[in-house]
A protein has these predicted regions:
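Charged DNA-binding/catalytic regions of mobile-element recombinases
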Residues: 1-204
Length: 204
């Protein structure tokens, strides 16, 4: 009997990610249950090259129109935008979404069916936000979840080190990463998410 093997991302797909990594955003949804067993949907956008979480928002009723508006907001305030947007084949990425994204000038790249590894960077962030934040917090409602995620994203972007980018945080200034003070100063710990995490700074 011929043995079958699970195949990873194709060489063509890997080449695309390698060649255009600095021009790619990825987006995805994940679900969060509140303490009253309501289901909330979290939509987020992450930059492939820097690992910066560009946008995160919560809704109880995701639609193609709502999802498209999130991409529009990503491109506001002179943030710039990517050339490519990687996402799966969820029904929320419908005709309205397609039209709005195309008008912005971003090309959609749909992953194959049942291939989460094709959107691995987005999937990895979902794992991080769950294990480092949501698994330790009781969520009361939509507003509370938005607040918790905003605080975690601030920590993730500005302070959390990433192995894939040389143990730097996505938005950390290079000066912070390389600065060595000639004079020793007191180090203070600043709590994040109710002391779930801490960031460390030199005292002024």
């Amino acid at each position: 009997m011929q043995r079958t093997h699970r195949r990873g991302p194709s060489t063509t797909w890997r080449s695309f990610l390698r060649q255009h990594g600095s021009e790619i955003w990825a987006c995805d949804f994940f679900c969060v249950r509140t303490i009253t067993f309501r289901t909330l949907y979290v939509f987020f956008v992450i930059d492939h090259a820097s690992r910066q979480v560009i946008h995160v928002h919560v809704t109880r009723h995701p639609t193609a129109s709502w999802t498209a508006q999130q991409i529009v907001e990503c491109c506001a305030w002179d943030r710039g935008s990517a050339r490519f947007l990687v996402h799966d084949r969820d029904s929320c990425y419908g005709a309205t979404f397609d039209r709005r994204v195309r008008n912005i000038g971003i090309a959609e790249v749909r992953t194959p069916f049942r291939s989460p590894r094709a959107n691995a960077i987005a999937e990895r962030w979902v794992r991080s936000v769950r294990t480092e934040c949501l698994d330790h917090v009781f969520i009361f409602n939509e507003r509370h979840l938005q607040k918790v995620l905003a605080e975690y994203v601030g920590y993730f972007n500005d302070w959390r080190p990433h192995r894939s980018i040389g143990q730097r945080a996505p938005c950390a200034p290079l000066a912070r990463a390389s600065h060595r003070s000639a004079q020793a100063r007191e180090i203070i710990a600043i709590p994040v998410l109710g002391c779930l995490h801490h960031v460390y700074q030199q005292a002024a």
